[in-house]
UniProtKB/Swiss-Prot annotation:
The lineage of its organism: Bacteria, Pseudomonadati, Pseudomonadota, Gammaproteobacteria, Alteromonadales. The keyword NAD does not apply. Its cofactor is Mg(2+). This is Deoxyuridine 5'-triphosphate nucleotidohydrolase. Its EC number is 3.6.1.23. This enzyme is involved in nucleotide metabolism: it produces dUMP, the immediate precursor of thymidine nucleotides and it decreases the intracellular concentration of dUTP so that uracil cannot be incorporated into DNA. It catalyses: dUTP + H2O = dUMP + diphosphate + H(+). It is an enzyme of class 3 (hydrolase). GO terms for molecular function: dUTP diphosphatase activity; magnesium ion binding. It comes from the Bacteria. NCBIfam families: dut, PRK00601.1. CDD domains: trimeric_dUTPase. GO terms for biological process: dUMP biosynthetic process; dUTP catabolic process.
Length: 152
């Protein structure tokens, strides 16, 4: 069963020239988001540009959130990743989805109208409440971190 999520189309080319984000395969975790630009743009090495996706969503369910993640091929082949590394969309956010596009590569990258730029993944959320303690119960790891377990 799929969870219904409200979506607004902010760019009329979505649904006519470009499809609404959807899962590419039955096993896909993410839906591709497109660069809904007015014209193609070149992203210089080291440059970060905010790109509209042409949609807004309202998750509405506080047990869910959406995350915007980079597409693996763009990052590996061209150095195109997210400027904020991960975009977190809270369940009560209703504004436009934007992608912070960062060229961490050494060559300029041209982004065309409608290019698939990032992916949208829905994840479960647990809202925690802190419980103040003076000491933690012992664990096998304790305070070990940052390389504590080695690489082999």
């Amino acid at each position: 069963m799929k969870t219904p999520i409200e979506v607004k189309i902010l760019d009329s080319r979505i649904g006519s020239q470009f499809p609404l984000p959807a899962y590419a395969t039955p096993g896909s975790a993410g839906m591709d988001l497109r660069a809904m630009l007015e014209t193609s743009i070149q992203v210089a090495p080291g440059e970060t540009i905010l790109i509209p996706t042409g949609i807004s969503i309202h998750v509405a369910d506080s047990s869910l959130a959406a995350v915007i993640l980079p597409r693996s091929g763009l990052g590996h082949k061209h150095g195109i990743v997210l400027g904020n590394l991960v975009g977190l969309i809270d369940s009560d956010y209703q504004g436009p989805l934007m992608v912070s596009c960062w060229n961490r590569g050494s060559e300029p990258f041209t982004l065309e109208i409608g290019d698939r730029l990032a992916q949208l993944v829905f994840v479960p959320v647990v809202q925690a409440e802190f419980k103040l303690v003076d000491e933690f119960d012992n664990s096998s790891r304790g305070e070990g971190g940052f390389g504590h377990s080695g690489t082999k």
